[in-house]
């Protein structure tokens, strides 16, 4: 990079440009020999949903969604559910959150009240307390209205240990955590519900396209559903397909696990309004961000049992087994069998097709 280069929106979009910023500029400065004093089983360099240090699961996320209120949620519910989900997909129980507000001078107290009420409701729904926080106010014009950062911690459970024991009955499994790099050929891929609801509901509302009348964000804390699935056993990896959508999640899994992934378009739930909006806007629902969905990698022998557990929850009612993992010699990257009977490569989006949704 040249000295006069500046940050662009793409640097925060979750795609390749952001990955480059992290790997070239950030990781090199944050890795040092002090790390050796700690038992770090999932590190910053893993770029997973959370890190794990001395058996504590830890994650953080800043929320800059625009507008602050949208169909189905607001920045408050999003900031609570988003961080809980990043902990929950590690297969552990979230213990608590921090919450830090950056507010612009002049922000209406009535709106702040609505947002805080919404955070409280999400926290109660999930059964995860907000334990510590911070509030800063900056001069008018120096931020846009409000940003919220939430961090969260989680702890390992007996169920996670049992889940991994069960995996080991069926195949080799290394390590003690559900990581993006854990997939093996033969594993099945479960998606817990329809894709694109959050991104399209928000975009449509923001731009006035009209689809928001029949569509809401899926923002929801998934910890209870995911804990129930872990109790079934056989799960090797989980991820919430947020920025970059399902396409990004599956490509991360494929790259980090060194496997191919085959999915079937016919099996992927897409709501009619999302389908219609994507047709109109020339977008791919697989690349649109979700805030209340998880992708689960599971040994084939237990895929139906895990699916059944997911479907027992309202938030997982539309879940489906959408594909399976292939050996790289058989298939590289992520490939989808299309409704037309063809095959297409599913790439990770380079940037964010819908900016400012989380
Ligand atoms: Mg995540």
Where are these regions (language model features)?
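Short, Lys/Arg- and Gly-enriched loop/turn segments at beta-strand edges
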Residues: 196-204
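Short amphipathic alpha-helices in soluble, non-transmembrane regions
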Residues: 305-315
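Glycine-rich phosphate/pyrophosphate-binding loop regions near the starts of catalytic domains
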Residues: 8, 16-191, 197
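Active-site-proximal betaalpha loop/short-helix elements
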Residues: 10, 14-22, 104-106, 213-290
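Aromatic/hydrophobic pocket-lining residues that form π-stacking "cages" and hydrophobic walls in ligand
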Residues: 83, 119, 250, 274, ...
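Acidic, Ser/Thr/Pro-rich beta/coil linker or hinge segments at domain junctions
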Residues: 313-358
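Helix N-cap motif at beta-to-alpha junctions
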Residues: 298-304
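Short Gly/Ser/Thr- and Asp/Glu-enriched loop/turn motifs at secondary-structure junctions
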Residues: 45-47, 288-293
């Amino acid at each position: 990079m040249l000295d006069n280069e500046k940050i662009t929106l793409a640097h925060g979009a979750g795609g390749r440009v952001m990955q480059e910023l992290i790997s070239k500029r950030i990781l090199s400065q944050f890795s040092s020999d002090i790390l050796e004093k700690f038992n770090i089983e999932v590190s910053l360099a893993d770029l997973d949903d959370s890190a794990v240090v001395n058996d504590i699961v830890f994650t953080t996320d800043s929320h800059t969604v625009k507008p602050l209120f949208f169909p189905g949620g607001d920045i408050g519910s999003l900031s609570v559910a988003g961080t809980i989900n990043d902990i929950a997909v590690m297969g552990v129980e979230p213990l608590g959150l921090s919450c830090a507000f950056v507010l612009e001078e002049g922000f209406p107290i009535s709106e702040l009240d609505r947002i805080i009420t919404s955070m409280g409701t999400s926290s109660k729904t999930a059964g995860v307390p907000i334990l510590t926080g911070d509030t800063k106010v900056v001069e008018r014009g120096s931020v846009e209205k409000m940003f919220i950062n939430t961090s969260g911690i989680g702890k390992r459970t007996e169920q996670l240990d049992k889940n991994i024991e069960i995996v080991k009955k069926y195949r080799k499994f290394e390590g003690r955590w559900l990581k993006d790099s854990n997939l093996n050929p033969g594993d099945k891929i479960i998606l817990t519900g329809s894709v694109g609801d959050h991104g399209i509901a928000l975009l449509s509302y923001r731009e006035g396209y009209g689809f928001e009348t029949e569509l809401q964000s899926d923002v929801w804390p998934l910890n209870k559903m995911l804990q129930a699935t872990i109790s079934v056993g056989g799960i090797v990896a989980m991820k919430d397909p947020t920025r970059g959508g399902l396409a990004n999640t599956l490509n991360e899994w494929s790259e980090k696990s060194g496997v191919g992934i085959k999915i079937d378009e016919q099996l992927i739930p897409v709501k009619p309004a999302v389908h219609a909006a994507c047709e109109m806007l020339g977008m791919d629902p697989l690349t649109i961000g979700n805030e209340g969905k998880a992708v689960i990698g599971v040994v084939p022998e237990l895929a139906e049992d895990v699916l059944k557990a997911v479907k027992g929850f309202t938030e997982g009612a539309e879940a489906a087994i959408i594909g399976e993992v292939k050996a790289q010699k058989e298939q590289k990257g992520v490939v989808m069998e299309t409704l037309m009977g063809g095959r297409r490569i599913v790439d990770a989006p380079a940037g964010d097709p819908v900016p400012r949704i989380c």
